[in-house]
Amino acid sequence: MNYEIVVGLEVHCQLNTESKAFCGCSATFGKAANTNVCPVCLALPGALPVLNARVVEDAVKLGLATNCTIARHSIMARKNYFYPDLPKGYQISQFEEPICSEGMIHVELEEGRKDVRLVRIHIEEDAGKSIHDIGDDTYIDVNRCGVPLLEIVSYPDMRTPKEASAYLQKLRQIVKYLGISDGNMEEGSLRCDANVSVRPVGATEYGTRTEIKNMNSFRNVERAIEYEAKRHIEVIEGGGVIVQETRLWDADKLETRSMRGKEHAHDYRYFPDPDLVPVLVDDGMMHRMREELPEFPEDRAARFVSEFGIPAYDAGVITVERELADYFEATVNVSGDAKASSNWVMGEVMRTLKEKYLDIHEFAILPERLGGLIKLIGAGAISNTIAKQVFEIMQQDEATAEEIVKREGLAQVSDTGAIEAAIKEILDANQKQLEQYRSGKTQLFGFFVGQCMQKMKGKANPKVVNEILKKLLDA
């Protein structure tokens, strides 16, 4: 029997607000344990929460960006459960009246576009963190308590691990473009739980699902879903029954293991939080949030193609990250050459970022400086080879490309007399290759070009070299 996989994702997106969701404590990641905490975080007697307005605005932005219906009136609820890293004994969340519902995310796949429906987006606060890797004891860090989250719940519309990964990547791209989260999965800014089931191809009823946690990369999301689906099929075909439960993904062993029985909504005894007033979204906020929406990747890529004339592939790569697209556009404004700019951004810039584990905002060469370098190439002042040398120097030096070229004596040589003299010396020193070329082995042309560039330390104008070399070889 053939089976199809059915996947729905629950994604927790940590917002990059300065303060927490319901108090003034810092929401910064990486502080010393138990230092970003106050009576509100711990729900001490008499401490009252106040909802951070920025959290509501970010929720509305994400709702608009994902084609959701925005609730003009929603309520905060208490989700009651016991866990050592939840000192309140409950988590402030939303249940019956979420702020956003019934949305859609369009995901581009190799085989075409996939539309993934959203059940809801709701506001909630994060819990603390249990630390198990210090000796034999378990420690609790409550810094994360109260950090604002948006939970994005999809319908079970995905049918393969790759679709789930692509959906998650698209969601990450959206929150980063909006500027509401850094989307860092390794630091927990974007956490994903997958609900996985299988059913016979053609069936309309869903199978029993299991929830998978602890997937901290797109690759692990794919691996975990693939493993769990295979496990389901093996259990079913072996005559067993799938137990509805929560399972933990073990990235070292590449397997899931049982964590606990899957809870139902009634297990959490949700009820409206009596300390918080309803969340109201008026026309003014809706208008402001719409005005603040950025130009999204698909629209920006289309504009880059039509306005700058770069290939659709280049535009797609450059617009994956908003900051990279900003960098490219600023570079073009200086260089005046969009195609050369896209080549440099996709080539040397992205290579350097990858090698040095940098984000574009950490890159030493600002777009104005890169644009200046590209402008020198276009003007014939330096060759591409020299430009790469200058590019490396610019990463350690705050001088402009033009200043470096002058200081290091790297200006391109276009003097026909000097180039012709160098070529004649090379031909005299390589008589055997010269005879072979004139006997029909024309691929040696590249050999002579290389010899000339080497002799002139890469500073010879390639166009002039080619013209003079061809004239002398054919003489």
Curated annotation (Swiss-Prot):
It comes from the Bacteria. Gene3D superfamilies: 1.10.10.410, GatB domain, N-terminal subdomain. It catalyses: L-glutamyl-tRNA(Gln) + L-glutamine + ATP + H2O = L-glutaminyl-tRNA(Gln) + L-glutamate + ADP + phosphate + H(+); L-aspartyl-tRNA(Asn) + L-glutamine + ATP + H2O = L-asparaginyl-tRNA(Asn) + L-glutamate + ADP + phosphate + 2 H(+). Its EC number is 6.3.5.-. Keywords: ATP-binding, Ligase, Nucleotide-binding, Protein biosynthesis. InterPro entries: Asn/Gln-tRNA_amidoTrfase_suB/E, Asn/Gln-tRNA_Trfase_suB/E_cat, Asn/Gln_amidotransferase, Asn/Gln_tRNA_amidoTrase-B-like, GatB, GatB_C_1, GatB_Yqey_C_2, Gln-tRNA_amidoTrfase_suB_CS. It holds the Pfam family GatB_N. GO terms for biological process: glutaminyl-tRNAGln biosynthesis via transamidation; translation. The keyword RNA-binding does not apply. One of its GO terms (molecular function) is glutaminyl-tRNA synthase (glutamine-hydrolyzing) activity. Heterotrimer of A, B and C subunits. Belongs to the GatB/GatE family. GatB subfamily. Allows the formation of correctly charged Asn-tRNA(Asn) or Gln-tRNA(Gln) through the transamidation of misacylated Asp-tRNA(Asn) or Glu-tRNA(Gln) in organisms which lack either or both of asparaginyl-tRNA or glutaminyl-tRNA synthetases. The reaction takes place in the presence of glutamine and ATP through an activated phospho-Asp-tRNA(Asn) or phospho-Glu-tRNA(Gln). This is Aspartyl/glutamyl-tRNA(Asn/Gln) amidotransferase subunit B.
